[in-house]
Swiss-Prot record:
It comes from Homo sapiens (Human). It is a multi-pass membrane protein. Its main location: nucleus. Residues 1-48, 66-85 are annotated as: Disordered. Belongs to the ARL6IP6 family. This is ADP-ribosylation factor-like protein 6-interacting protein 6. Residues 38-48 have a biased composition (Acidic residues). The lineage of its organism: Eukaryota, Metazoa, Chordata, Craniata, Vertebrata. It is found in: Nucleus inner membrane. One of its GO terms (cellular component) is nuclear inner membrane. The modification Phosphoserine is found at S2, S36, S60, S65, S80. InterPro entries: ARL6IP6 (IPR029383). Signal peptide: none annotated. The chain crosses the membrane at residues 111-131, 150-170, 205-225.
């Protein structure tokens, strides 16, 4: 019999039969869990130390992660944190704040490049129109009053094919830069596997329209020069 059990029994004898005594919990006592004196108390202290260490680790981890959360999520006017929308793994608010100083020069440069390209294209089309007009006007009439062109078949064919190829190349390039696979080389009307899964089409309609534009341009030039 241990010292704790003898003290507990003597306390019960001293109390009267009508006096309520404290509820004894011998199964949860730290003195009766071990075989000898103080063994259960040592085990309980070790468990408490382990819990305390775990709590300290959690508190330290929370203290380290809290400034990062505050830096990423700034508080609102009422003190509540603002949760930004995350798209493709990037916070657009942070990205927009960094790209804000460089936004207007890029836009101005793109507008100037577009205007320069449009002016160059208009200049080339004007030259082509003058050439086609002069070639169409240079016709001779024979004795039977039949117009005879100065251009031969092969010359007419080469000019028509050159115009059609130029138009097709321009449309093909625009479609290439505006397609779902701009990094694919060489560009092909046949759709890659990813594009086929997205749209369900087995061919790229934009490249087919580029080829059709070239054919129409070649036929138009040939008809004008005849």
């Amino acid at each position: 019999m241990s010292f704790a059990e003898s003290g507990w029994r003597s306390a019960l004898r001293r109390r009267g039969p009508g006096t309520p005594g404290p509820v004894a919990r011998p199964s949860y006592s730290s003195f009766t869990q071990g075989d000898s004196w103080g063994e259960g108390e040592v085990d309980e202290e070790e468990g408490c130390d382990q819990v305390a260490r775990d709590l300290r680790a959690e508190f330290s981890a929370g203290a380290w992660s809290e400034p990062r959360k505050r830096s990423v999520l700034p508080p609102d006017g009422n003190g509540s944190p603002v949760l930004p929308d995350k798209r493709n793994g990037i916070f657009p608010a942070a990205a927009g704040s960094r790209a804000q100083p460089r936004r207007w020069p890029v836009q101005v440069l793109s507008i100037l490049c577009s205007l320069l390209f449009a002016i160059l294209l208009a200049f080339l089309l004007a030259i082509a129109y003058l050439i086609v007009k002069e070639l169409h006007a240079e016709n001779l009439k024979n004795e039977d009053d039949v117009d005879t062109g100065l251009l031969g078949f092969w010359t007419l064919l080469i000019i028509s094919l050159t115009a059609g190829f130029s138009c097709c190349s321009f449309s093909w390039t625009v479609t290439y830069f505006d397609s779902f696979e701009p990094g694919m080389f060489p560009p092909t009307p046949l759709s890659p596997a990813r594009f086929k899964k997205l749209t369900g089409h087995s061919f790229h309609m934009g490249y087919s329209m580029a080829i059709l534009n070239g054919i129409v341009a070649a036929l138009t030039v040939a008809w004008c020069l005849m």
